[in-house]
Every structure is written in structure tokens, then in C-alpha cells.
Amino acid sequence: MSGPSQDSEPEAKVLHIKRLYRAVVETVHKLDIIISGKSSYREVFKPENISLRNKLRELCVKLMFLHPVDYGRKAEELLWRKVYYEVIQVIKTNKKHIHSRSALECAYRTHLIAGVGFFQHLLLYIQSHYQLELQDCIDWTHVTDPLIGRKKPVSATSKEMEWAQMACHRCLVYLGDLARYQNELAGVEAEQLAERFYHQALSVAPHVGMPFNQLGTLAGSKFYNVEATYYYLRCIQSETPFDGAYGNLKRLFDKASKMYHQVKKQEMKKLSPSRQRSKDIKRLLVSFMYLQSLLQPKNSLMETELTSLCQSVLEDFNLVLFYLPLPAHGSQSASEEEEEHDSVGSVLPDSLIFKMVVICLMVVHSLKRGASKQYSASIAFTLALFSHLVNHVNIRLQAELEEGESDVPALRTDNTDDADARDHSSAALSEERTLQNGSLEEDDDEEEEEKENGEDEPKGNGRTVATKKNQEKKRSAEEKQKQKRKFSRLSMLRRRRCAHKEDESDLSEGFESDEEEEEEEEGGGGGLVDGLGAPRVQMNSLGRDTRKGPLPEDGGWESGSEEDEGGTAFDVETDSDMNSQESRSDLEDMEDAENAPQQPQQEENEQPQTSREENATPPVTNGPSVSNDASISSNLQAMSSQLFQAKRCFRLAPTFSNVLLRPATTTPPAPESNPAPVQEITPPTGETPRNTSPEIANGTNDKDPDSNSEGSEHSNHSFHSEKTLSERLEILTNQGLIQVVKVFLDWLRTNTDIILMCAQSSQSLWNRLSVLLNLLPEGSKILETDIGLNKDVTELLSECEHPSLAQTLLLPEDMALRHLPALSIAHRRLDFTSQRPPLTPLDECVVRVCCIRSFGHFLTNLQGNVLHFNPEAGIFTSISQSEQDNLVQQAKAQFRMAEEEARRNRLMRDMAQLRLQLEVSQLEGSLQQPKAQSSMSPYLVPDTAVLCQHLGLLRQLAASGCFIIIIPRTVIDGLDMLKKENSGARDGIRFLETEFRKGNRYIRCQKESGRSFERDKLKRQDTEAWHLYKMVDSCRQLTGSQSSGDEDTAGMVTILTGHSLEELSERSASMKAAVQAVAAAGMELKNIIEFYRQWKEMG
């Protein structure tokens, strides 16, 4: 005990504390006896037991204020556990006995409400007693008496003040828990309230990870556990983590593994477009969760399997980002009712994308800290994911900036009653916002004002109710129509993946992944938890989530299989055992009765596997803190080269089903300097606009992270009118993914070693980033326009073009990621404790623009030649110096001819398109240089002798990436016949099996199609000649002679043999005729040794 002196008063106080503590122990013992009984759920709400709990509550309150340092925490714990939590657990454990509208249910509801009232009162009393200043942190603040005009003197010690601060934090956690338990009851919507309490607890004590664990429990199985994973990782990486989060996260990863293998096993099934969207999003989220579970520090996996999974997730991520919100319909036919709920899960919200990217950053940080061998793979995947994200930001911004330039029909052809659609309060205002938020809102008559504000809008936008209502009043009817045209323009970008077959080529730009049948699920609906949920009182956190609504049985967001008790009082069941005071993970452990099935072979992995030639990188001075920097750099470049691969310009044979697809209709005339893109894909069936411009198709041309066509350049559009600066800033303000870009660039700025190691292998990322930088307005132009910016923002604008910009203004995304270890260096200059000036959404947007453009100049100063900046034209480029000089000259000529301000946007797009044209020409040259074109064929067809005797040479040809090796069925049959007596045949079979399993795009097995002459008599007389004839038939399929094409196919295919040509011709007349048939079919027959020597001589 502590006391200032040993006089009689402290002695009396000590005796009083002892008596209180003894009374508390006795009361707790009586309550424990009640709780341990078999029918405790009936006993807990009897009047005498309620009185006993009330007595314990009074004793605990007295004890904690008499001696807060020694007894405060213990009294809090006993009060929460014995008075509230254990009663709640008894009821939840026996919920099958608690029927709806029964006396027990009524008593339970009253118990929860009484707990909320008590802790709110306790929170206010602690603030008042210790004069705490929490106005910027929480809603329930103590208001000083205005008549006094000054604070009361506080005689508490520093330790007592510390306890008071943390007691307020814990009260907020308890309030969040009580709201979460209320949310599980039928007819109660308290999820947003619980989330708000948890965020306020974080604002009071941001270093404590407990509220993150509670947010993860609150999220439940929404978005297939991705959201919960984000919160558990945040809890684990907090300064004071909660031990229970480790078990909770492990349980989610175990679920992810099971769900991933279930998804892979499900049969393919044709679905409606909206259900297909839900299935694609489910596949993405489940695969993403499984990948993150494999990237944990203690896990180990084969590199090829990990690479295959990374590529699959990237394909799905790129596909799902093309899904934009469907327009709201005023009326709905009966046939559409089945798909009504699917729209809820048909879009990936921006807040979820934010969480996914931050999960990647947290995993990279933990792998680096643990010196894990998965570190390189994690970085390569994260950069590739961000590359896709930047590309889609470019596409969306470009579509907004070019709104009205071309007539694009609406995606859906349903007859929509526009008048009814306009009756929705958010129809006119939030169509543009739904792009940012990523999901459509559901109507709720009880909260009309929140419906108008876009509940799922991230906090980063900071829009208030009043601001939105004023904007809505100011909008004219013409502007409403303008918004609708804009939405149809954006909705055109949606597409679905094309169907694929076993013999489909890797070389098309389309997407491919297994389609699986959506499993039927039951679960309570839940609002979307905002990933940017910074605990700031001034923000309308209650109005940023998607309102809870009925979720689809097939393709919904919920992945859990919680059962709804038919007649019980509980609506949903969550893992509420993961509560604030206990690590109850042992109570929730799900014993796996069977081992997880092995992951199916990735036979259809369509991603390329190129040779891993390491690029020379500048010396890294700030490398990862692992044992072998050179090994990390090598592995990172190799992994990046696989995830960021350059497309090759091959003309695909008709044998492969996914031949190059071209736009179905006319194309707007393009400038002479901007030829049509090399490869394009059409939108999917069921969502195909009538007029698909090549620019839009080109934007979707992105199967792997390194697409030549960035999709956001539309330089061949002539502008009828340029967007004003205010309109451009409004578009940027409404683009929610800009926040994710800003956060990721903050991380990259503090990890220059990663930038330098991936400078060459991640060229696609820098290309897309340069396009985004050119779309953002310059700081000087914003300063010249009077748009009513904050004074501090104006000062920041003056340094916008400096590479060493020091951000001092806090953004919502910075607050949301406060104390995140991965961003600790980036946030070292930010003051999270001082009073922040209020920033409007426009101010926040301008700050993001400053940070992103400053990062662009930061890249131009790096020694790896990542980006270049042309001061006169004011544009960024990401090409070699010689190409840059050429582009700069053209830019200057066009810049002088154009009007400086009105033509600025078009110039930037022209420059970007020229850069892409040069890249395409470079890639075309890899196969179409004069020397190579004259004597080298793109398709090589080896015979059995090559695979048995010259497998090493064939490996080198395949690894070069210059040829596609086609293995006909007849060659495989020949190897099968020789495998018993020929070891070379067995080696060849093993080699082919390995390459097919990896999905090597340069070694393909050809499936026979079309009519083939069997020559059964010849097969008996001369087997080798018969095999050669069969190979000629296979090659005819490659050259397209069975199709109606008019192209010259001479020299397209070379048959490689392990025998000398003279020897073959002298063997028999049948063999000689077969050799002549090769030449007659326009093919070449060469000895592999001679072919290899000739190829080496030509370089």
C-alpha cells in the first residue's frame, strides 16, 4: 500500500480497502457457485442473483477508485467478468433453451443494455474525476462546467493518471463487446456501433492490439475471412499484442486451406453474370487467404507451386477489378429476383482492397523480420498486385476524364424505369461514388439520411451529411444525366473470363482459371467494415459501411457455416469467445477429423515460365535484414521476372482455342504514330457492349502483371472539351483506390532496396505508375486555381514537385495505419497527437496528389533509371534513355503546336501511347528480326529421337523463350513404347511431365483435332515413317491449313529430328516419301544439332 505518511488516516484507508477486497472475494465465490450449476441459465437472472451482481459491481467501483494503482485493474477485470461476461457466456452456451420473446431472452437483452449504460457512466466518471482530455478520441467526453471556466485541480499521481487513461480504453472495449453481443440478437443492428467503440478504444491507446482482435471477431467470416485476417494481423503486429490473436489467425488459415481445396474440387457450371461475379470474387478471396497462409514465416512450399498460386491470384485480382457496380434499377421483374442478392457480392469494395494490400505489406514485414526464405516471393507478389491496382486506377480515371467523348451503350439491356431509379435517394449522387466504394448500397427505411451518404464510403473521403445534401441540391437534371452516362462508360469495362479448354494456349491475353460451383452457405448478413476506419470522432464512421442485408445462399460474402436456430433469439453466431479479456482460442478449436487434401496439380497454369537470367542491379546499401542479401536479390529478381513477364508477339495457330480476338466493330481513327495494339480481347459473353473500342479492350489486356497495353491511354480520342481542374480533382477525390496507392508508395519510399532490385523485372509497374503520374495535375497548376484550399495544404503544394516532400498533414489512411511497423519509418514525421486542422475531402485529395507526384520525382533521382521526367513537357516516362530522347523530341514538337493548357491532357496520353508503341515494337522484334525471321521458325516439333538423345539441347531451346516447343500425341506414344528399354525415353517423359505441371508456356502438348490419315498398312510396315506422317498431320493443324485463313504459313513450323536427314531418306521408300511430304506441306525438317548450331551462330 502506498501513502504519504503513516498517520491514522492512511491506516483507516488501508483497512477499508482490505475489507472491500474481502467482500469482493466472498461475492465472487458465491457467483462462481451459481455459474457452475447445470441450470445456471435459469438461475443467473433470479432477483437474488441480480442483487448479488449489483453488490459486486458497487464494491469493485469503490475499490478501483480508492486505490487505482494496486487494485484498479483487478477490480475492472472482476467487474467485467463476473457481473457481465460470464452471464453472457452462460446464455450463449445454452442459447437453444432461450426462445424468442421468452422471459429469459428479455432478461438477457436487459442485461446487455444495463451493461452499456453502466460502462458509459463509468467512462464519463473516470474522465471527470481525473480531468482527462479525450475530446479528439471518443464521443462520450466529460464536459467542463462552463460556469467554473477552469479545470478542477487533480491530485492524482502519474501512475493513477496512466490507469485512468487505460481504464477509459478498456471501458470502450467492453462497450464494443456488449454492442457485438447485442448484434447477435435478432432484430438488433449494432455492428457499426461496436466497430465505432473499438476504433475509439484504439484512438485512446493506439499501441494496444486488443481492439483489433475484437474487430476481427466482429468481422466474422465476411469476405471469406479476409477482413478478420487483416485485423488479427494488425493485433499481432501491435506494440502490445493480444495472445489470443495468434490462435484466431491460425484457425482462419486452417479454414482457408480447407476452403481452397474445396473450391478447386467443385465442378464447373454455367452461371448468370451476377452469380459468376460472386464466384470469381470468392475464388479470389479464398485463394488470397490460402496464399497468405503459405507465406507465413514457418511455412515451406515448393517454389513452383508458390509461383503458380501467386499467378492464379493475380489473374483473379485483375479480373475482379474490372467488375464495377451495376446500375440501380427502379423496378425488377420476377425472373430477376433470384439474382437480386447477388449484386451485394458482385463488386470488390475499395475498403477490402485497402485491407488486402495492407495484409501483403504486413506479411512482407514479418517475413523480413523472420529472415524467411518466402520473403522474395512475397515482395514479388505484392509488387505485381500493386501493378494491377495502379493499372485499374488508370483505367477508371481515364474513363472519368474522357466521359462524353464517345457514345458507349450501357452494359445491361434491361428496360430500366429512369423515373423510379431517380426516386432512390442515392441514385444520382452515388453512382460515381459506388466506383470508389466498390459495392452497391441497400435501401433501409430506418436510416434514410445514411442511405444518402454512401455507407460503404471509406473514411478517407470524410464526406459529411450536410456536404452531400448540399451537393445533391445543387445538381441539375443535366448533371444527373451526365452521371448516368459516366456510369455506363465505366460499366463497359466489366468483363468475364472466357471459357478455356485443356489445349488452350498460354499466349493469349485472356484470363483462365478453374470455375467452381459456389457452395451453399448460411450466415448472418453483416455490414462492411471500413478498412480506413481511423478512430476519429469527426468522421461519420457510422455512415461508411454497407448496410446489412440478405446475402445470397450461392455466392454470398459469408463463408462460415453458422446455423440459424429456428426458434431461438439469436440471429447470428460469431466466435465471440475471442473476447477482450481471454484468449479463448482453446474453447473454439475445431478438431480436424481428416487431413486437408493435397493441392491438385496445377496442370492448367497458364502463366509463362521464362529463363531466370539475373539482371545486374546497383549495389544495395539498405538491404533486407536477412542473412544473405545477394541470395535475396537473386530470388527476388527471378520471382519478379515470372510475375512481371513481357508478352511475346506470336501468331497463334488455329489449333489453340484462344486465338487472338479482335474488336467486333469499328474503331475510332487513330493517329499514324499510334497503331492498333498487338493483342486484344473481347468482353465476355453476357456483358458485351455493342461498341467495344480497342482502347477499352486493350485496357483489359492484362493476364499477367506485365501487359504491354496499359489500358489507360486513349490518345486516339480527340477531345471535344477538356476537364477543368476542379472537375479533375473531384474525379480524383471520388476515386477511393488513390488512398491505397498513396499508402503503398509511402512504403516503397522507405524500401529503396526493393525498388532497385526490381527496377528491371518490374518494368510494367513503373510504366503504369508513370501513366498515373501524368494523369495527376501538377502542383503549380493547382496553386494557380483558386479552389479554396486549406492554408497548410497550399504550403504543401509549393513542394509538390520536390522528391523529398515532408508530409505533415494527417490523412485518414495514415490514422488507420498508425503504429503499423511496416510504415513506421514513413510515419516518423507525422504527429498523431497534436490537434489536426480540419481537412475537406478536396484538401485530402490534394495532399495525396502531392505525395504521389513527389514519389515520382523521388524515383527519377534513383540510380536504377526507374523513371524519367521531362520538365518542359511535364511528363514522366519509364523507358531507356535513347527511347526517352526520341519521345522528348516528339513531345516538344507536339507541345509547341498545341495550345498549352487546353491540350495538356491529350499530350500526356499521346506520350504514353508512344512509349507503349515502342515497347510493343521491341517485343515484336524478339521474334521478327530479319535474320531470325528468314531461317528460324516460332514452332518447333521434336520427334522421339530428340527427346531420347538430345534432351539437353531441347531444354536450352525451350528456356531461351524464342520458340514454342510443340509435343504431338504421336511423339508421346513413341516415348511410351520406348520407356521400358530406353532410359532416355524415361528422362524425356519425366521432363515433359515436369514442364506440363509447371505450365511452361513454351512447351505445349498438342491435342489432335481434325481429320488424320491413319495409314494402318504403313504403320505395320514402317513405324518410323508412319510417326513422321502423323507429325506432319499435327503440323498442318499448327499452320492452319485446315482453316480458312489466307496467311502464308511457310517456314512457320520446323520438325526437329535426332537423325541426320541423309540417313532418314536412305532408310526406306516410305521414309523418303514422308520426308518429301514435310517439304510439300511448307515445313522444314532439320537435325536438332544443326538447328541448335545455326541458332547459336545467329545470336
Swiss-Prot record:
<feature type="compositionally biased region" description="Polar residues">
    <location>
        <begin position="618"/>
        <end position="631"/>
    </location>
</feature>
<feature type="compositionally biased region" description="Basic residues">
    <location>
        <begin position="482"/>
        <end position="499"/>
    </location>
</feature>
<dbReference type="GO" id="GO:0043009">
    <property type="term" value="P:chordate embryonic development"/>
</dbReference>
<dbReference type="InterPro" id="IPR019458">
    <property type="entry name" value="Est1-like_N"/>
</dbReference>
<feature type="compositionally biased region" description="Basic and acidic residues">
    <location>
        <begin position="419"/>
        <end position="434"/>
    </location>
</feature>
<dbReference type="InterPro" id="IPR002716">
    <property type="entry name" value="PIN_dom"/>
</dbReference>
<feature type="compositionally biased region" description="Acidic residues">
    <location>
        <begin position="504"/>
        <end position="523"/>
    </location>
</feature>
<feature type="region of interest" description="Disordered">
    <location>
        <begin position="403"/>
        <end position="631"/>
    </location>
</feature>
<feature type="compositionally biased region" description="Acidic residues">
    <location>
        <begin position="440"/>
        <end position="455"/>
    </location>
</feature>
<feature type="region of interest" description="Disordered">
    <location>
        <begin position="663"/>
        <end position="722"/>
    </location>
</feature>
<keyword id="KW-0963">Cytoplasm</keyword>
<feature type="compositionally biased region" description="Basic and acidic residues">
    <location>
        <begin position="701"/>
        <end position="722"/>
    </location>
</feature>
<dbReference type="GO" id="GO:0000184">
    <property type="term" value="P:nuclear-transcribed mRNA catabolic process, nonsense-mediated decay"/>
</dbReference>
<dbReference type="Pfam" id="PF10374">
    <property type="entry name" value="EST1"/>
</dbReference>
<comment type="function">
    <text>Plays a role in nonsense-mediated mRNA decay. Does not have RNase activity by itself. Promotes dephosphorylation of UPF1. Together with SMG7 is thought to provide a link to the mRNA degradation machinery involving exonucleolytic pathways, and to serve as an adapter for UPF1 to protein phosphatase 2A (PP2A), thereby triggering UPF1 dephosphorylation. Necessary for TERT activity. Required for normal embryonic development.</text>
</comment>
<dbReference type="GO" id="GO:0005697">
    <property type="term" value="C:telomerase holoenzyme complex"/>
</dbReference>
<dbReference type="InterPro" id="IPR011990">
    <property type="entry name" value="TPR-like_helical_dom_sf"/>
</dbReference>
<feature type="compositionally biased region" description="Basic and acidic residues">
    <location>
        <begin position="469"/>
        <end position="481"/>
    </location>
</feature>
<dbReference type="GO" id="GO:0042162">
    <property type="term" value="F:telomeric DNA binding"/>
</dbReference>
<dbReference type="Pfam" id="PF13638">
    <property type="entry name" value="PIN_4"/>
</dbReference>
<dbReference type="Pfam" id="PF10373">
    <property type="entry name" value="EST1_DNA_bind"/>
</dbReference>
<dbReference type="GO" id="GO:0005737">
    <property type="term" value="C:cytoplasm"/>
</dbReference>
<dbReference type="GO" id="GO:0070034">
    <property type="term" value="F:telomerase RNA binding"/>
</dbReference>
<keyword id="KW-0866">Nonsense-mediated mRNA decay</keyword>
<feature type="domain" description="PINc">
    <location>
        <begin position="938"/>
        <end position="1061"/>
    </location>
</feature>
<dbReference type="InterPro" id="IPR018834">
    <property type="entry name" value="DNA/RNA-bd_Est1-type"/>
</dbReference>
<keyword id="KW-0539">Nucleus</keyword>
<feature type="compositionally biased region" description="Polar residues">
    <location>
        <begin position="688"/>
        <end position="700"/>
    </location>
</feature>
<feature type="compositionally biased region" description="Acidic residues">
    <location>
        <begin position="560"/>
        <end position="576"/>
    </location>
</feature>
<dbReference type="InterPro" id="IPR045153">
    <property type="entry name" value="Est1/Ebs1-like"/>
</dbReference>
<protein>
    <recommendedName>
        <fullName>Nonsense-mediated mRNA decay factor SMG5</fullName>
    </recommendedName>
</protein>
